[in-house]
Amino acid sequence: MSVTVPESLGWSPQPVIDWLFSEGRLLDDNSRFVLQLAHQLVACGAPIERLLLTIQTLNPEIAATSNTWISSTDSIVPFSAQHGTLKTDRYIGSPMQQLFETEKRVRQRLDQLPEGAHAAYTELADDGFTDYLALPIMFNWGLGSALILSTKCAQGFSGTDIENFRILRNYLSPIIEVYSLRHLSKSLMNTYLGKRTGEKVLSGMIQRGDADIIHAALWFSDLRDFTHLTETLPARQVLEMLNEYFEFVSAAVTARGGEILRFIGDAMLIVFPIDDDMCQRTACNAALDSAIDAQSTLASLNHRRRRHGEPEISFGVGLNVGEVVYGNVGAPDRLDFTVMGPAVNRTARLESLTKTLGCNILFSERFSELIDTPSSYLGMHEMKGIDGTQAVYAVCDS
């Protein structure tokens, strides 16, 4: 489906501004927002066949996100620019770089390109576009976004068109800033707290003592000989090794619905919550499969590390299932989310036994009853700080 774009015969941005402050500002999805914004502009006579809205982010992997509307297909093309993108030819010398460095609008007639023009211009010109306008969107702390418009009208953008777009940009800025702050908060919460915990904080679970009782499959893992490694390796190499370890474990657990709740030095506390989306058996199988996958990935990773003369990585995993307190604890002005309870303690003690029993993955009796993978009984064992002895199990071929 395509959208018919009118010739520039004079138009007013007021209907679009009215929409922005009524329905538009309530749209939480940026793709839908850009699509509806484009439709509103076309409906009031703006001569555009392409609209792009880009927003800078604070994310360890992504520098900016953008959504591009194209009239010929009436569709949205999303894009996430990795931090490395800023060092590529795609960005260097581009109108986007010019805009973000000067914080001034960029205008270029695409039917009058100079020799050696950047690919961002020539590709649009090859598609029949005649004019390009990029407007900076300023936030309270500086430049945070940009609105980019292109047309195929033979005469390009008129002075009236550009002034109307400038007026619209001024009304658009506070709405995009609020949207950016909301999603920035969500991104930072997910990055530093995890998705489940971040959502709880944003939903208002922020007072000390706020807690839920949840049922979950639990994972506790710990690197072998980490103290020795920190004493003998340069700090930079230790950090690189930790990040490599955390990355492949994260990939294994998040693929199956697990959430890294805490990094504790070289240890990881991970939960597979049992809820409407994941029953008890499913959660336990997911936790075990994640542990097996992580250990499998470790084998190939260590093969590479040996070739490069780097120390191998080794870690144990304790798995358990039970009821835990998932809550907000700490000092009045410094809080943290954590999981507490006897089930958590036993999970950590199971991991400690992986060293003495020579198995990389150990789990409790109740956990063994809920998994589909055959397990081996390794006897009753004492656990530090826990009365009596506890049954310990392992995967048959571990």
Language-model-detected regions and their locations in the chain:
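Regulatory loop-to-helix N-cap segments in sensory/regulatory domains
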Residues: 2-5, 150-166, 339
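Alpha-helical scaffold within the catalytic cores of cyclic-nucleotide enzymes
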Residues: 38, 243-257, 274, 278-317, ...
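Regulatory sensory and allosteric helical modules in signal-transduction proteins
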Residues: 72-130
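Short hydrophobic beta-strand micro-motif common in sensory/regulatory domains
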Residues: 130-138
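Short beta-strand-to-loop transition segments that serve as allosteric relay/switch motifs
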Residues: 138-139, 146-156, 275
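Regulatory cytosolic signal-relay segments
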Residues: 160-213
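Catalytic NTP-binding/metal-coordinating core of nucleotidyl cyclase/transferase enzymes
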Residues: 205-289
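Cytosolic regulatory/linker segments at or just downstream of nucleotide-handling modules
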Residues: 347, 353-398
